[in-house]
A protein has these predicted regions:
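Bacterial N-terminal signal peptides that target proteins for export
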Residues: 1-9
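C-terminal motif of bacterial Sec signal peptides marking the signal peptidase cleavage site
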Residues: 16-20
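Positively charged, phosphate-engaging catalytic surfaces used for nucleic-acid and nucleotide handling
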Residues: 23
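Insoluble glucan recognition modules
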Residues: 26-59, 63-73, 85, 99-128, ...
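Intrinsically disordered, low-complexity boundary segments flanking structured domains
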Residues: 64, 79-80
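Beta-strand signatures of extracellular beta-sandwich domains
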Residues: 74-78
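Surface-exposed loop/edge segments in extracytoplasmic proteins
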Residues: 83-94
């Protein structure tokens, strides 16, 4: 009889232990109802070739919302001249998942300004950045924009004799 009671006690303890391991915490999948917000580290950037390796600009953003679905959110970041309505935009980040910032050095940002936007040395260009967040299997898109200006420089030749 003692043997059956001990088996019954162990069976009940096992059931209690297994039922205590249920994880009902779904907050990691539910990004909540956060508003998508894009921010720039600086609103006015003057690039200097002597600091070519330093960080020039960082654009960072909040997660936005996945509407409680638990689905992944992908982000697309575009840059364009102010007032162009993103007609000929530079796509900095495309369909990135779990990426919440974009950072460029002085040299990298100057190259983007000169090669894509046609900037010349000393020219101050007003830019807009637009972040679009898309949730898998949802039609709604979340959009946030921010504005900043950048002054380019004319790099010295990279060929040395």
């Amino acid at each position: 009889m003692k043997k059956y009671i001990s088996h019954l006690v162990f069976a009940l303890l096992g059931c209690a232990a297994l039922s205590a391991c249920v994880d009902d915490d779904y907050m990691e999948l539910d990004k909540g109802q956060n508003e998508l917000v894009l921010t720039a580290s600086k609103t006015e950037v003057v690039l200097n070739e002597q600091a070519h390796a330093d960080d020039a600009l960082e654009l960072s953003w909040t997660t936005g919302t996945n509407y409680g679905t638990g689905n992944k959110i992908s982000y697309t970041l575009e840059l364009t001249k102010t007032g162009s309505d993103f007609a000929d935009s530079y796509v900095a980040v495309e369909n990135a998942v779990q990426e919440y910032s974009w950072k460029k050095s002085v040299e990298e940002l100057n190259d983007i300004l000169r090669n894509h936007f046609g900037a010349t040395a000393g020219e101050n260009i007003s830019l807009e950045a637009r972040l679009t967040a898309t949730v898998t299997e949802r039609d709604e898109k979340q959009v946030s924009t921010t504005a900043f200006s950048v002054t380019a420089y004319n790099p010295l030749t990279s060929t040395l004799y």
